[in-house]
Structure formats: structure tokens, C-alpha cells
Amino acid sequence: MSNSNIHTTAVIAEGAKLGKNVKIGPYCIIGPEVVLHDNVELKSHVVIEGITEIGENTVIYPFASIGQPPQILKYANERSSTIIGSNNTIREYVTVQAGSQRGGMMTRVGNNNLFMVGVHIGHDCKIGNNVVFANYVSLAGHIGVGDYTIIGGLSAVHQYARIGEYSMIGGLSPVGADVIPFGLVSSKRAVLEGLNLIGMNRKGFDKVKSLSALKAIEEIFSGEGNFAERIKQVAEKYNNNSIVIQIIDFLNQDSNRAFCRFEK
């Protein structure tokens, strides 16, 4: 453990192997069969257990848990492992779990990856290099992910699925099948279905004006002519309805995004 910077509150079991310039922050827990290669940094409250190896220059943020047993009923305490490569960034609350007898006894992560807050990598997954998993991406067991893949936040991937190289999965996508290399996958996005009439009534908005505003947005989003013309026409037609005027003002503001598509 020479040349390592270890906080006095860290708990490092006898047998753990630390490379040069390893930094271990407050309240980290390192098991006896853990190997941390050169320049690994654990910020604080990081737990690394099991037969686990972390490659050089990897940085792990608070409350991440690496190398714990897989979440499967048939796990029989087999001596499976977790291998993580070099130059990875593993953010807060990420979990990477060990392999199992049914999956080759190893969970493996490559190099130069970014796992954002709350990512879960299940048992026996094989993750390539240069991938980005956004917040709360969840991978079940036995999943293969190719190099340069990007998975959007809150997406979940079914066990045994294969995600090909250079593919991109949009946020909030449930993926239950293989994704081809270079594929672009996304789930149905949120749509505008009307107005929040119940909430508006609870807040004391006039019921007649609320129903009139509902008709107005139907004319804006599904009427004849182009969008700008429809906005202008509706603004003139409902100029005495404060709810409609508030919606029109919002529509006329500059935005970096499109509007939710209207589906009646």
C-alpha cells in the first residue's frame, strides 16, 4: 500500500492490493480480494467487494457499489468476479455486480467508459469501450454492449440482449431485443393529450374558459394552415380568454426544443 493516499476512516481488508498513487477517500470499504491499479481514485463511501479488479486511472464517486454478489436466486456463493478496465468514470450510486456460474463467472467492463448516476450493470454483463450510460440506465444479466454505444437515461435492457457497436438508445426506452450495430432505438415520446382540466378546476380556473382553451389548443395543433398562422388566428379568436393568452405567450417564446406532439 505504499505511495497510496488513504483516508483514516477507510476500511481496507488485509489482502487487498493497491497500485501506485491510489487515492481512497473517507469511509470507503475495500475487500480482501480487491485489486486497485495505479492512479485509481475512490472519492468517498465507495464499497468494493468480491474478486474485483479496477483498472488504472478509474475514478469512482460516492456510494457506488462494485463487485457485490449477483441478484439471482440461483446464486450459490460461487467465486465469480468483476473486472473493470482503465480510465473509467463511475458516478454516484452506480452498481456493478459480479458474474455467476451460468454466465461465465465474470462481469467485465472495458476502458474509457462513463457511467452516470444510478447506473446498474447486472451479473455477467460484458461492456465494451468508450460507452456512455446516462443516469439510471439499468442492465439486466448477461447483456453484451459494444464499443461507442450510448444509452439514454432511465432506459432498461432485458437480460441476454446484445447492443451492437456505435448504436444509440434514446432515454426512457425499454429494450427487450437485440440492437444492431449503428442502430438508433427510441421508445414513444410523451404526447400532449389535452389540458389538465381537473387540476385547473382545483385551482379555481373558470370552467367555461378552461373548456374553451381546450378547443383552442386543438385548433392550434391540428387545424389548417401552418403552425404560426394557426397561433395567430387562435390568438385573435380567443383574445378574451386569459388561459389561451398564457398558452399563446408560451408558444411564441424562443425554445431549444420542439413542442410535444398533440394526440387527441
From Swiss-Prot:
- Which GO BP terms sit in this record? lipid A biosynthetic process
Q: What class of enzyme is it?
A: transferase
Q: Which Cys pairs does UniProt list as disulfide-bonded?
A: none
What are the protein's UniProt keywords?
Acyltransferase, Cytoplasm, Lipid A biosynthesis, Lipid biosynthesis, Lipid metabolism, Repeat, Transferase
Species classification:
Bacteria, Pseudomonadati, Pseudomonadota, Alphaproteobacteria, Rickettsiales
Question: Which chemical reaction does it catalyze?
Answer: a (3R)-hydroxyacyl-[ACP] + UDP-N-acetyl-alpha-D-glucosamine = a UDP-3-O-[(3R)-3-hydroxyacyl]-N-acetyl-alpha-D-glucosamine + holo-[ACP]
Q: How does it assemble?
A: Homotrimer.
The subcellular location is: Cytoplasm
According to UniProt, the name of this protein is Acyl-[acyl-carrier-protein]--UDP-N-acetylglucosamine O-acyltransferase
Q: Which GO terms describe its molecular function?
A: acyl-[acyl-carrier-protein]-UDP-N-acetylglucosamine O-acyltransferase activity
Q: Which InterPro entries match?
A: Acetyltransf_C (IPR029098), Acetyltransf_C_sf (IPR037157), Hexapep (IPR001451), Hexapep_transf_CS (IPR018357), Lipid_A_LpxA (IPR010137), Trimer_LpxA-like_sf (IPR011004)
- Pathway terms, separated by semicolons: Glycolipid biosynthesis; lipid IV(A) biosynthesis; lipid IV(A) from (3R)-3-hydroxytetradecanoyl-[acyl-carrier-protein] and UDP-N-acetyl-alpha-D-glucosamine: step 1/6
- Which E.C. number(s) belong to this protein? 2.3.1.129
Role description: Involved in the biosynthesis of lipid A, a phosphorylated glycolipid that anchors the lipopolysaccharide to the outer membrane of the cell.
The family classification in the record reads: Belongs to the transferase hexapeptide repeat family. LpxA subfamily.
> From the record, what ranges are coiled-coil?
none
Task: Identify the GO cellular component terms for this protein.
Answer: cytoplasm; membrane
Alphabetical list of CDD domains matching this protein:
LbH_UDP-GlcNAc_AT (cd03351)
